């Protein structure tokens, strides 16, 4: 029973913080402070980190955290270098954008060098995977509707996107499952199909001859 309670508490913590970058930043603030102070190796030697249990283990597994400003200043629009070959949307993610925003930034630069305009609407949010995994499908669908609408609105204002790319493979798999979440809602099933059909892992998208040739030329 204690384990069930503990697991439920962990689920609620994940549900409350992980899908929301600002809350995640707040939760990670102590880690940033401790790492900047350089005191963590001493705390490990003294056994203090072991006293923190799972939290201490999690800190050891965390990658170097990029500056928060990188996420906050992530451009909404990136222009293709040279002739444009495609317009793509980018799902920046929640955990991905907090912990690895530099990877999203590098991806956007590669896409631009491959001849793509890149759109990263600010109104997008968590894909809903975390809520779906713990059984909160209503919240998962709410987040899905928000993402679908974010890219629909972008296309209405700026024109159609040829693809919607993502770095996080697990989240990408969930984005492709959206139509199955709305089988009892004709309108959103149609809208989610239109969205999901455009979703590709960034490596999948760039593995096309036209983009590979363009990228190779830009690196010479």
Predicted regions and their residues:
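Iron-sulfur cluster-binding electron-transfer modules in prokaryotic oxidoreductases
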Residues: 1-220
């Amino acid at each position: 029973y204690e384990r069930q309670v503990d697991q439920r508490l962990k689920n609620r913590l994940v549900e409350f913080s992980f899908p929301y970058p600002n809350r995640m930043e707040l939760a990670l603030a102590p880690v940033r402070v401790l790492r900047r102070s350089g005191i963590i190796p001493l705390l490990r030697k003294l056994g203090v980190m072991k006293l923190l249990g799972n939290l201490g283990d999690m800190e050891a597994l965390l990658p170097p955290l990029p500056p928060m400003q990188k996420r906050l200043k992530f451009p909404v629009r990136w222009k293709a270098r040279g002739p444009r070959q495609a317009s793509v949307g980018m799902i920046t993610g929640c955990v991905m954008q907090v912990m690895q925003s530099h990877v999203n930034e590098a991806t956007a630069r590669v896409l631009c060098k491959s001849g793509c305009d890149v759109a990263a609407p600010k109104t997008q949010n968590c894909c809903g995977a975390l809520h779906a995994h713990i059984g909160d499908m209503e919240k998962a669908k709410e987040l899905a509707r928000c993402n679908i609408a974010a890219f629909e609105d972008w296309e209405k204002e700026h024109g159609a996107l040829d693809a919607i790319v993502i770095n996080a493979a697990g989240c990408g798999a969930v984005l492709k499952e959206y139509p199955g979440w709305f089988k009892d809602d004709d309108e959103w099933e149609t809208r989610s199909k239109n969205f999901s059909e455009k979703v590709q892992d960034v490596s999948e998208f760039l593995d096309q001859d036209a983009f590979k040739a363009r990228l190779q030329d830009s690196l010479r």
